[in-house]
Regions:
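Active-site nucleotide/adenylate-binding loops and adjacent lid/helix of ATP-dependent enzymes
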Residues: 128-201
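ATP-binding N-terminal substructure of ATP-dependent carboxylate-amine bond-forming enzymes
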Residues: 1-124, 141, 155-159
Length: 201
């Protein structure tokens, strides 16, 4: 599962932090977290990524291990169990760069918490804070102004007729974690819709 050829010369090391960060992801966010720990504590974080990226692949401040299909639940759990076994009994902190990884951590919190410190809220609260349709009600309760929002299910085209909005619209997936796994031509994080035809498309 792990591609040892992608490891830099030195292994991960907790340094003065007293805890080893295990970071999931291969983007600038993963590098930034590793750099912050390195600058503050001399830590060499362990970064698990699905591929070797130029941002983390050759960095001397972290150890990068490639785990193919890391975002797949069984692979995710097996990889983290192997890391925990390898580093036991050292304290580990699990950090994620990607909503889908945060959600996987939250869904398996009880299992992972036996080996990792998890700095994320429980799943129920995570859903309230990150699901856009539920977050809207929280804003209303707190009196926080936000753009007028309505939830539309593409599987129910007739539902659009009752929405209290008019074009042009900005559309986003209600769950960015779930949307990560969706694959279709023209996929974007945000859609700008000038009319109904753009929505149907």
């Amino acid at each position: 599962m792990n591609d040892n050829r992608t490891r830099p010369h030195a292994a991960a090391d907790a340094g003065a932090a007293g805890v080893l960060p295990v970071i999931l992801g291969g983007d600038i966010g993963a590098y930034s977290l590793a750099r912050a720990f390195n600058e503050a504590y001399g830590t060499r974080s362990l970064v698990l990524s699905q591929s070797r990226t130029h941002l983390i692949g050759g960095s001397s401040i972290l150890e990068n291990r490639v785990v193919e299909r890391l975002e797949s639940e069984p692979v995710f759990l097996a990889a983290l169990a192997a890391v925990a076994e390898e580093h036991a009994p050292a304290p580990l902190m699990l950090l994620a760069c990607g909503d889908w990884y945060v959600r996987l951590i939250a869904e398996h919190r009880d299992e992972l918490a036996a080996s990792y410190a998890i700095p994320y809220v429980p799943l129920e609260l995570l859903d309230r804070l990150t699901q856009k349709d539920r977050f809207l009600s929280l804003c209303a309760e707190a009196g926080v102004p936000c753009p007028r929002t309505a939830v539309y299910d593409p599987a129910d085209p007739a539902g659009l007729d009752g929405l209290p909005l008019t074009f042009p619209l900005v559309a986003k997936a209600a769950s960015s974690a779930d949307y990560h796994y969706a694959q279709f031509p023209g996929k974007r994080k945000v859609f700008f819709l000038d009319d109904r035809a753009a929505l149907d498309e």
